[in-house]
């Protein structure tokens, strides 16, 4: 094997010298290099040139390359035209490519889908087009983040609403390969991967509420089992603990109480005006928590929590169709 080569015969980094882009093309493009030299399809997707896309895709040679991963004029990682258009937020190009046969859930070398990069770059229109075309609202299990997590972190409530409307899971599913590994073989050992946690850490109250309305677990924001003993020492032990430690306003605490959080998970006696976290505990938030902890929840509140949990988060959208009086349905929907 030549120096700098790989076991499969592809050239290694050394063979391309300092031209990293060329090496990436050699390693990850879908077709031989001579086919990858023509990047007009990918370049048109990048600049949003719909007319050029229409013209090129009239030819069979380009239609056959619509899902080809290739390095384009301004990019380093080989991507499909759809992924490139979604990154740039060219909604008309995204829509056209899908109608011409582009696969919506193909991933790049990082495991990112077109939907994920549309969300990351804040493109609501492209996000909606991809969701309407059947893109998985949860992104790819081969990527460490999800569209919901990113939208919650940056406070894009409009994008988060769209993801939830199309069935995105608002809880963490901590199984990378559920088809292969035994069920529950991986346990949650940190809250930092959870949408509720990250929305609280960045004080995005609207996103926090949307997640709870969609049925997010108010304690650990996780689908599977939780290993609290595996949490880092000094890290929050539940979502309520995180809300207090991050100095969130009282509204965050009130929402968790309203949605049935287990208040006994927090050792609130150890919390004072100063927190071991990066911020001070909000005095009003701490007072709301202590008051909620000191008195039993009302029967009305307990009934609402019980009904919503019995329905399950994937059937909460059916509440408006239940044969119940409108005031009760609004109550169940927290309206």
Swiss-Prot record:
Protein name: Ankyrin repeat and SOCS box protein 1
Residue windows of the ANK repeats: 36-68, 77-106, 110-139, 143-172, 191-220, 235-265
GO biological process: intracellular signal transduction; male genitalia development; negative regulation of cytokine production; proteasome-mediated ubiquitin-dependent protein catabolic process; protein ubiquitination
Pathway assignment: Protein modification; protein ubiquitination
Subcellular location: Cytoplasm
Annotated keywords: ANK repeat, Cytoplasm, Developmental protein, Repeat, Ubl conjugation pathway
Molecular function terms from GO: ubiquitin-like ligase-substrate adaptor activity
Domain SOCS box per the UniProt entry, residue ranges: 286-335
Family: Belongs to the ankyrin SOCS box (ASB) family.
Keyword Repeat: yes
Species of the source: Homo sapiens
Domain text: The SOCS box domain mediates the interaction with the Elongin BC complex, an adapter module in different E3 ubiquitin-protein ligase complexes.
GO cellular component: cytosol; ubiquitin ligase complex
Subunit structure comment from the entry: Interacts with CUL5 and RNF7. Interacts with TAB2 and TAB3.
Gene of this entry: ASB1
Role description: Probable substrate-recognition component of a SCF-like ECS (Elongin-Cullin-SOCS-box protein) E3 ligase complex which mediates the ubiquitination and subsequent proteasomal degradation of target proteins. Mediates Notch-induced ubiquitination and degradation of TCF3/E2A and JAK2. Functions as a tumor suppressor by enhancing CHCHD3 'Lys-48'-linked ubiquitination, leading to inhibition of the CHCHD3/ROS signaling pathway. Suppresses TAB2-linked 'Lys-48' polyubiquitination and consequently facilitates the initiation of NF-kappa-B and MAPK signaling cascades. May play a role in testis development.
């Amino acid at each position: 094997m030549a120096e700098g080569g790989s076991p499969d015969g592809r050239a290694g980094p050394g063979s391309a010298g300092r031209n990293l882009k060329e090496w990436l093309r050699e390693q990850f493009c879908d077709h031989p290099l001579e086919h990858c030299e023509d990047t007009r399809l990918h370049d048109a997707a990048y600049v949003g040139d719909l007319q050029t896309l229409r013209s090129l895709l009239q030819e069979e040679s380009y239609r056959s390359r619509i899902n080809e991963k290739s390095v384009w004029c301004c990019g380093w990682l080989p991507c499909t035209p759809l992924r490139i258009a979604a990154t740039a937020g060219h909604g008309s190009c995204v829509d056209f490519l899908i109608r011409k046969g582009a696969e919506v859930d193909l991933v790049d070398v990082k495991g990112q889908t077109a939907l994920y990069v549309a969300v990351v770059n804040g493109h609501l229109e492209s996000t909606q087009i991809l969701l309407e075309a059947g893109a998985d609202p949860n992104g790819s299990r081969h990527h460490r983040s999800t569209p919901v997590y990113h939208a919650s972190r940056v406070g894009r409530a409009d994008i988060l609403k769209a993801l939830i409307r199309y069935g995105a899971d608002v809880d963490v599913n901590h199984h990378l390969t559920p088809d292969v590994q035994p069920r529950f073989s991986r346990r949650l050992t940190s809250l930092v991967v959870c949408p509720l946690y990250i929305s609280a850490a960045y004080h995005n109250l609207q996103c926090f509420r949307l997640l709870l309305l969609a049925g997010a677990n108010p304690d650990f924001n996780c689908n599977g089992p939780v290993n609290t003993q595996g949490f880092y020492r000094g890290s929050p032990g539940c979502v309520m603990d995180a809300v207090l430690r991050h100095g969130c306003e009282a509204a965050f605490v009130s929402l968790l109480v309203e949605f049935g959080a287990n208040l006994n998970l927090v050792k609130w006696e150890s919390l004072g005006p100063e927190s071991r976290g990066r911020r001070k505990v909000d005095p009003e938030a701490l007072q709301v928590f202590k008051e909620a902890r000191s008195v039993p929840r009302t029967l009305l509140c307990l009934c609402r929590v019980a009904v919503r949990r019995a329905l399950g988060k994937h059937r909460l959208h059916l509440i408006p169709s239940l044969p119940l009086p409108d005031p009760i349905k609004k109550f169940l929907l927290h309206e």
